[in-house]
Amino acid sequence: MATDGASCEPDFARAPEDAAGAPAEAARKEFDVDTLSKSELRMLLSVMEGELEARDLVIEALRARRKEVFIQERYGRFNLNDPFLALQRDYEAGAGDKEKKPVCTNPLSILEAVMAHCRKMQERMSTQLAAAESRQKKLEMEKLQLQTLEQEHKTLAARLEEERVKNKHVVLMLVKECKQLSGKVIEEAQKVEEALAQLEEEKKRASGLEEELSGEKRRSAEMEAQMEKQLSEFDTEREQLRAKLSREEAHTTDLKGEIDKMKKMTEQLKRGNDSKPSLSLPRKAKDRRWVSVSVGTEGPGTGSVACQTDLGVESTDHVKKLPLTVPAKPAAGSPLVAASAKGSGGATAPLARPGVDRQASHADLIVSSPPTIPPPNTNKIEENGPSTSSGPDTPSSTAPLPSNAAPPAIQTPNAAAQNYPAQAPSTHTVHSPCANAALHPALTPRVQAVRFRFQGNANNDQDQNGNNTQSPPSRDVSPTSRDNLVAKQLARNTVTQALSRFTSPQAGAPPRPGAPPTGEGSTHPPVGRTSLKTPGAARVDRGNPPPIPPKKPGLSQTPSPPHPQLKVLLDSSRASNAGPKVDHKTVALPPTSVPQGNRVINEESLPKSSSPQLPPKPSIDLTVAPAGCAVSALATSQVGAWRAETPGLKPPACSDRPLVIPTTIAFRCPINPVSASSCRPGASDSLLVTASGWSPSLTPLLMSGGPAPLAGRPTLLQQAAAQGNVTLLSMLLNEEGLDINHSCEDGHSALYSAAKNGHTDCVRLLLNAEAQVNAADNDGFTPVCAAAAQGHVKCVELLVAYHANINHAAAEGQTPLYLACKNGNKECIKLLLEAGTDRSVKTRDGWTPVHAAVDTGSVDGLKLLLYHRAPACGDGLDTEASRLGVFDLDEGEANPESTPTPVIPADLINHANREGWTAAHIAASKGFKNCLKILCRHGGLEPERKDKCNRTVHDVATDDCKHLLENWNALKIPLRISVGETQGDNSGPDEFESEHTICALNIRKPTSWDDFSKAVSQALTSHFQAISSDGWWSLEDVTLNSPAEASIGLSATSVLSITLGNVPWSVGQSFTQSPWDFLRKHQAEQVTVLLSGPQEGCLSSVTYASMIPLPVLQNYLRLVEQYHTVIFHGPEGSLQDYIALQLALCMKHRQAAVGFSCDIVRADVDAGFSKEQLVDLFIKSACLIPAKQSPASKKTIIILENLERASLSELLGDFLAPLENRSPESPYTFHKGNGTSECYYFHENCFLVGTIAKACLQGPDLLVQQHFRWVQLRWDGEPMQGLLQRFLRRKVVNKFRGKLPSPGEPVCKMVDWALSVWRQLNSCLSHLGTPEALLGPKCFLSCPVVPGHAQATVKWMSKLWNAVIAPRVQDAILSRASVNRQPGLGQTAAKKHPSPGQQAVVKAALSILLHKAVLHGCPLPRAELDQSMADFKGGSFPLSLVSSYSSCSKKKGENGAWRKVSTSPRKKSGWFFSPTWSKPDLSDEGIKSKTISQPNCNRNASLSRQKCLENDLSLALNLDQRLSLGSDDEADLVKELQSMCSSKSESDISKIADTRDDLRRFDSSRNRPAPSATVTNPRMPVSQKEVSPLSSHQTMERSNRTLKTELGVSRVKSFLPVPRSKITQCSQNTKRSSSSSNTRQIEINNNSKDEIWNLRNNEQIEKPNQ
């Protein structure tokens, strides 16, 4: 069984079956199993099991042997490294025997698997080989670079050695110098030791001298103590003797007063005087108990004064409630009761002496008459003249009262107040006789002089009788002395009243009913505490003049030693935060300089007084006089507004400072105000003169300047000079023995007083009388000093003419120029400068006139000091140039070259006072920005100079001045962007500039390099966003208003390099010097930013030059590199050639950077460019390579420009397949002229770029389209859509030096108009179906940007229209209209010989385009636009083109194409005839007839004019002048023109009204010519100058109005061609109507609104409104 099994076939698959089947058959034949016993069966089973095991062993052995034989035979040639054997080995060892399956039963499949595996391995090895080759190339390149670096290293090492040698030499030199310096140091140390030894000796000597000096001081102190003791004893004895003397003098004075009083009363009774004496002596003695006197020696120098009317305790209460506190004078002057009110009408404040607080009752201080009301015609006797009774209509010598103010029944004393800021204001008690002298209109000079003499003697008597002005007030004031004073004053009042009676006119009127008598019951309302509000304001007092001061400090700031209290009062009066207050309410001060005719308005309402007798207070509205004009003390209480800190002179009453008007003024009646001519400086007539009724001819003789305070002048001459009384002064000057140069105790002469008060006539009289012109007072001030300080120009001019010393310096060093600058009077400054005064004189405090001018903030005075040249200087400024208005601050800053050269040197500008402050310190600390500007404009100013506290001008400056100083020293460097040198001059427009200014950088001293870097980056970012934004945003607003997608892709990273002048710099780089010092040292005039361009393989400079966004250019570059064949096409002027060239340059430099050479070949294609020339070009440029030749590594870029001139199918048709398959397998066979042919194929590295100036392809050229990559540059899409806007905006920024103007500027409007013209023009051409006439933005890039000259843009537009736009439109329309019209002649012949219909369509289209696209929206005014209309071609549409369709309706009415046009079922007839004018057919959309808003006469006239013109036109238009359109293309153009006019998306052409370019509707009736209301002479052609289109806004409004109003009034027919559908239906209506009517009107149908084509509205309706 084993043998049978072993002898079976070696097929292992069938072996088990055969081995099992053979023993089974033998067993069936030999024995039967069923017959076997159990043991046999067991034995048989064991035998079979053994056989099976042996068989399995044999099978496994055979399998192993077979495998080895197979492997050895089939795969013996493979080694152990074979991957298949490894696979088999791994497979056999990987799993068990039972799990193993044969890899493949078929050896072929095993072989195929091995081969596939081998292929994969081969591919992998090839890739690894290629990678190894690339690595080898890189390694070689790195070796080359390493060699170059080694060479550089060698050169650097050599340089380093040279530098080491140089440094070694330098070190040796430094060592030598150090040795020399060390020797010098040793010598200097020895000298220092010697100096120290000498210093010790000097110190010892100084200590000995100090000991001796201390001993001397002790001895002198002892002697002073002894002298003080003796002086105190002498003072005690002197006071006792003085008290005794005063008592005796008072007693004597009382007796004399009683005697004089009795004498005068006797004389009055003898003369028949009806009036009673004012007050008897017993009454005076009876009322003496109400006088309370308190004497204080150490109290403050203020006096509390009050007025009262009733006698009793209640009056005393009023005195306590209503005090008037004023600073007291240093000493007393006039008597207490020397000046009573007029007729006892008002109580005046008594004199308040230093240390005396006195409250006087009305009875003791005022002499009053019995309390009886006088009869109506009785005149009241007053001290200095009569006063008419109160009445509203009675003339009086008071200031004008406004009509709305009730005249109060009170009067103030007639004296002008005078204030002395250098000392405390005085209490006004003394009635000035000079002041009241001018109140009498009929007063003769002789009587006036007598009155002055009498009152002057009375004042002298007062001074002689116990009121010595030079002595201090007595400590022992007895009642007897006061009684004597009262008696003496009563006597003097009686005499004055008696004298006034004979010198006064008789006038009277009954008093106002209900008002208390002025003479007895009325009192002044109490005046509250007054204080200074501003430095230029003084204290407000009553109307009385001050008492005579004992010792005025004159022009000095420091008081005299005998009066120690004055210094305290002086300091208290200098408060700068106080103001004049009247009745506890501040009065607003007018400006410091009151011009002629100004009105000073006082407060309307003031607090009412607690006194029951006071009437309501009126609001005063006075016309006050300017400088030099005195104002009556009845009307005003003048206070000079001298600054508190002003050294020296005290202002007079007639100062040019503001006048403070008290409200407690008594007015008798209103008078006429003073004219402005009577209030000029130095004029003789004044407000008082005019008010008093003097004759103008007497004014110069009687008075000059008005009343002024006497100010304590002891002589009549000084009084007359101070008062300005020319008559009295001339009388006194004629007397013999009078000393005209006599000066009072303070050194003031008559000339000084007249000059100080501004009395020019008095000054002239005194100078003619040979008064001393340079006489100085105790403080060293001369008359010219006083006049200059007060601003009296005429007086200064007179004094200078009489050779006054204009350079005289006072005790403190003040010159007239200094005082004029301190006052801020520019006229005086100019006059003194022209006289040649010295500008460099300094005061004791080190102040110069420049300091004074700056301290007061006088800009004009400072300009004069710095720039005004004296006439003697030769080349000084002329009169006009030196005027203050010429040198303006802003103008000087904008035009530095126009600034005049300063006259004063830098030393004077930088001069420091005692505290170390320069004029710039003062201006900066006070915030006078304009003064600081003028000082900074001086080239020699040193703002870094420090004062004694080590502070600079910037340290003490206010915020505004600090900002000014920082910006003034800042360097304004322009920042410019450069795009580098552009290659290919013919590729881009000429408007592509290489540099553009974007802004100006302000570089200050503290600016760091980090700040500078941030400023440059921010400026670039802001500029890029500004030019790419949609609106005219400012550079500060672009970050907020500019959207992110509007950016053109440029940023700070697009910068290649930055140069500061000529020095290269990069952002973030720092130098040792600050940017301010660095730029000044290198004289950098600009900062230039260079953008990376094609030379660097970037397109940033191309983006900035062309304004095409950077992402778009990068996308174009990607297309060229990817597809190798790209064509750029778009309308003419879309920058196709420029884009292609810049992309080629960028690719060339990119390839050069990698190491490959690249050439650019440009070819300009024209109509004669043949395919053979193109082949030669390809072969020469190595783009076409012979089939047997291997390609080179060089790359080539071919640019074919202007492909639209040739046929693409003919030129490139044979190259399409080779261009797509660039290999030797797809060659191109080129047949030469000699019959030979060669095969070529295109190089893989050849790039073909073409440009076509055509919007779309047509005809056979479409076959070429699918073989190229096309880039369309549409005018209504990016990048062309926003290119023009961005380009023009950048042009405006460059023109305005980096600043964007506001949207309302004319430049912005003209730029927006040019942009809209380009867009509207292309939109209209698109509607016309003429894409070949579309324009790119290139020709609009030359739009001029001329600020202030909008006409230049219109002229440029007219030239562009005539040279470019109009010819293109004409050619496009003719070419379209002649396609089917003249097929035999072609388009060229049709353009040369157009038919009349074509001419009509062309001119109609030009007129429509001109009005709709160009003139529409022009920002020029109507008049200028009318003048510019004649420059545009095609603006006038001639009348000879008007005709009708019916002339050829029979011949061409059956045209099939035209019939197609006329059979539109959606449109109905829009025209039929109406027999009348008054029944318009209104549309369903609500168009209503509106009446014309003008008179009926104008409407009737226009209607009649229209009818006449229509009749004339019907006679003028003959059949020969009509034409018809017979071409279908022409009709289609007409329809497109009509649809364009009625397009709602565009501006409606029907709204372009009032033009003479009529586009006429072709009427359907031959016998009814179309009338036109706009033709003035139908037999003459319409000239182009008559064309007058409106602006867009006016056009829309006017057209909307006339479109609705004409429907019912007048009908203007449109004469443009209409479709055939209208002609047919209109002709049917014509047959039904009479053909002989020439005045029929056409109405609009309800359903024909869209068919209206009226290019212009009726003009005569609007003409009456013009």
UniProtKB/Swiss-Prot annotation:
Residues 469-481, 1585-1594 have a biased composition (Polar residues). One of its GO terms (cellular component) is FAR/SIN/STRIPAK complex. Pfam families: AAA_lid_NAV1, Ank, Ank_2, CortBP2. Keywords: ANK repeat, Cell projection, Coiled coil, Cytoplasm, Methylation, Phosphoprotein, Repeat, Synapse. Disulfide bonds: none annotated. ANK repeats lie at residues 712-742, 746-775, 779-808, 812-841, 845-874, 915-945. It comes from the Eukaryota. InterPro entries: Ankyrin_rpt (IPR002110), Ankyrin_rpt-contain_sf (IPR036770), Cortactin-Actin_Reg (IPR050719), Cortactin-binding_p2_N (IPR019131). One of its GO terms (molecular function) is protein phosphatase 2A binding. The modification Asymmetric dimethylarginine is found at residue 501. Residues 1545-1566, 1648-1666 have a biased composition (Basic and acidic residues). Its main location: cytoplasm. The keyword Transcription does not apply. The keyword Nucleus does not apply. Residues 120-274 form a coiled coil. The modification Phosphoserine is found at residue 1527. Residues 1-25, 202-224, 366-411, 457-481, 501-619, 1545-1601, 1620-1666 are annotated as: Disordered. Interacts with CTTN/cortactin SH3 domain. Interacts with STRN, STRN4/zinedin and MOB4/phocein; this interactions mediate the association with the STRIPAK core complex and may regulate dendritic spine distribution of the STRIPAK complex in hippocampal neurons. Activation of glutamate receptors weakens the interaction with STRN and STRN4. PANTHER family: CTTNBP2 N-TERMINAL-LIKE PROTEIN, FILAMIN/GPBP-INTERACTING PROTEIN. Regulates the dendritic spine distribution of CTTN/cortactin in hippocampal neurons, and thus controls dendritic spinogenesis and dendritic spine maintenance. Associates with the striatin-interacting phosphatase and kinase (STRIPAK) core complex to regulate dendritic spine distribution of the STRIPAK complex in hippocampal neurons. This is Cortactin-binding protein 2. It comes from Echinops telfairi (Lesser hedgehog tenrec). The gene is CTTNBP2.
